[in-house]
Amino acid sequence: MKPACTLLSLTLLSSPFVVSAQENIEKTFTFGIVSNKAQSKIKKSTPFTQYVTNGLAGYGYTKGAVKVFKNYRQLAVALENGTVQIATATPFNAMTLEAESGSQAIAIRWKKGLQKYHTVFFTHKESGIESISDLRGKTLVFEKRTSTSSYYLPAITLLNQGEKLEYLPSSDDKPAKDSIGYLFLDEHLAQSNEINLSVWVYKQRVAAGAFSNFNWSNPKDLPDSMKGKLTIFARSVEIPRDLILASPTLSQDQQHKITSILLGMETSQQGALALKQFQNTKKITALTPEMSASLNTVRTSIHLLPKVD
């Protein structure tokens, strides 16, 4: 005898009400994140996901779920095949997801209260460096190769200005005279952070450093006792702090509805609380022409980034 569930399926398939039954199948709305801290991310983003899900009952979504992926390649597959409906990512990762999955950035997430930011290039006041071209033949320190403000963004800023970049495995190595040498702080220190990056520039172990304008303004990342000896000599374009992307499997109507829910979250007490629990998100806003233009810069430049083994 066949199992009851199989018999039930056969009954539904032969029923004249099969279409309406399929339309009313309960669906799960899934939010995708990349992290190595799965349990923490699930806990913090579940209220956010459930809030969005509650507004999508008309599309058959009755449950919300958070799925954490180990890398963006896995998330791209999930967005492309529709097992994940929306996801969050920083601009460079978001543009990679767009290219690999066909997903689309639909809104800006004010992660940790910030709408946008940019990279500052800074040096010791006694270095003689006044512009990007002065970095040729010298060494620039980035924090780590996964950092937006302390690698991706400053690197494409240099490349778009026609500069050559040369990876240096050791801090004792020197770049060619016509190249800008760069290294990653996390490959040289057990504790890689913004304050240690500031110290390297302050002590002139390297010619310059790069991190976000918010790091520059934060005494925890750059103490006032050091800041007086340092100076900013260049800045990148401003980019969104974080983005929400939608799966290409969603209809335009569904995308518009989801976007509408996201943009209105801060206006309700429950929505605002859900945002705050999710990495202290202040609000979610629409992409402005300025931010769309900066994303296009990222989109057209990301292939320029050097491949470092």
Descriptions of predicted regions:
Residues 123-140, 161, 165-169:
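Flexible hinge/capping segments at coil-to-helix
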Residues 24-50, 239, 245-246, 250-309:
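An extracytoplasmic/periplasmic, membrane-proximal ligand-sensing/linker region
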Residues 29-42, 134-151:
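Short loop->beta-strand "edge-of-pocket" segments that line small-molecule binding or catalytic clefts
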Residues 107-131, 244-247:
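Hydrophobic/proline-rich hinge and linker segments of small-molecule sensing/allosteric domains
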Residues 9-15:
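Bacterial N-terminal signal peptides
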Residues 141, 145-251:
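Pocket-lining segment of extracytoplasmic ligand-binding domains
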Residues 24-95:
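Extracytoplasmic small-molecule ligand-binding "clamshell" domains
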Residues 79-80, 135, 201-202:
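Hydrophobic residues within well-ordered alpha-helices
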